[in-house]
Amino acid sequence: RCHFVICTTDCRRNSPGTYGECVKKEKGKECVCKS
């Protein structure tokens, strides 16, 4: 499953086994997985 992680340079590095994109949230940026 996808999980939220703090977005840095590459979301894929932060969440191995998943793929996502950096999305701006109200409090900074988070990496959210796409289906």
Curated annotation (Swiss-Prot):
Tissue: Expressed by the venom gland.
Keyword Thylakoid carried by entry: no
GO CC annotations, alphabetized: extracellular region
Domain of life of the native organism: Eukaryota
UniProt keyword Transport present: no
Disulfide bond annotation, renumbered to this chain: 2-22, 7-31, 11-33
Keywords (A to Z) from UniProt: Disulfide bond, Ion channel impairing toxin, Neurotoxin, Potassium channel impairing toxin, Secreted, Toxin, Voltage-gated potassium channel impairing toxin
One MF term in the entry's GO annotations: potassium channel inhibitor activity
One Pfam family it belongs to: Toxin_32
Compartment annotation: Secreted
InterPro entries attached to this UniProt entry: Toxin_32
Function noted in UniProt: Blocks Kv1.6/KCNA6 potassium channels.
UniProt family annotation: Belongs to the short scorpion toxin superfamily. Potassium channel inhibitor family.
Identification of the protein by name: Tamulustoxin-2
Species, as recorded: Hottentotta tamulus (Eastern Indian scorpion)
